[in-house]
Amino acid sequence: MATYLIGDVHGCYDELIALLHKVEFTPGKDTLWLTGDLVARGPGSLDVLRYVKSLGDSVRLVLGNHDLHLLAVFTGISRNKPKDRLTPLLEAPDADELLNWLRRQPLLQIDEEKKLVMAHAGITPQWDLPTAKDCARDVEAVLSSDSYPFFLDAMYGDMPNNWSPELRGLGRLRFITNAFTRMRFCFPNGQLDMYSKESPEEAPAPLKPWFAIPGPVAEEYSIAFGHWASLEGKGTPEGIYALDTGCCWGGSLTCLRWEDKQYFVQPSNRHKDMGEGEAVAS
């Protein structure tokens, strides 16, 4: 029984299946962890969702910002952009089933035995684990409810960007969503910076990657995350695993086998893919 952690798939279905074949992933025996952003940019978002859903209890995933954006497009709140290549999914006969399943997925995964935590963007250093769990449940409860379109309409925005237990209402939910799905850099006090997307070496002072600021979760748990392709899986402290290696931008899809910390890599097919949404970062 092995545990495989894979970074952002972004609709790269062929690469996902090739990587799982490479590691001899066996559903029912092994467990697959996915860092979120299952969809958008790559050509196979529909196939990715169908496959991941079919795995049942053999998969543990978290929602990413592109997954949430897909839900907003599906409900008519956001525009379907051609570069995201979501039209086959949105027009599929099982779209309702797939997206209602997707919105009921978590923002946070925790394995106490392995001392492993996973979130799409990471864990803000302003939170301890009980706070992170409570915050994840707050957003998950809204997404699972009939009022989820109201939340999706209000989730866009960069403020508030500083955690306080006193945050309430939509501001609280927006901060939680940004921390779990969009965070990269923080100010030294842990306050989120929602604008910088470059590599850590190019970031303006005093910004630091969230994982470079000491926080209570990282003291006791390993943290796996995706979202930040420009890291190229490098430059994180011991126990912090950056798994997004930019498959949808022509990089690769990366898998970490947890038990022996061995990495497996599947190169992107995007150099073969010159259609709408080709591998050019925006």
UniProtKB/Swiss-Prot annotation:
<dbReference type="InterPro" id="IPR004617">
    <property type="entry name" value="ApaH"/>
</dbReference>
<dbReference type="InterPro" id="IPR004843">
    <property type="entry name" value="Calcineurin-like_PHP_ApaH"/>
</dbReference>
<dbReference type="InterPro" id="IPR029052">
    <property type="entry name" value="Metallo-depent_PP-like"/>
</dbReference>
<dbReference type="Pfam" id="PF00149">
    <property type="entry name" value="Metallophos"/>
</dbReference>
<comment type="similarity">
    <text>Belongs to the Ap4A hydrolase family.</text>
</comment>
<keyword id="KW-0378">Hydrolase</keyword>
<comment type="function">
    <text>Hydrolyzes diadenosine 5',5'''-P1,P4-tetraphosphate to yield ADP.</text>
</comment>
<protein>
    <recommendedName>
        <fullName>Bis(5'-nucleosyl)-tetraphosphatase, symmetrical</fullName>
        <ecNumber>3.6.1.41</ecNumber>
    </recommendedName>
</protein>
<dbReference type="GO" id="GO:0008803">
    <property type="term" value="F:bis(5'-nucleosyl)-tetraphosphatase (symmetrical) activity"/>
</dbReference>
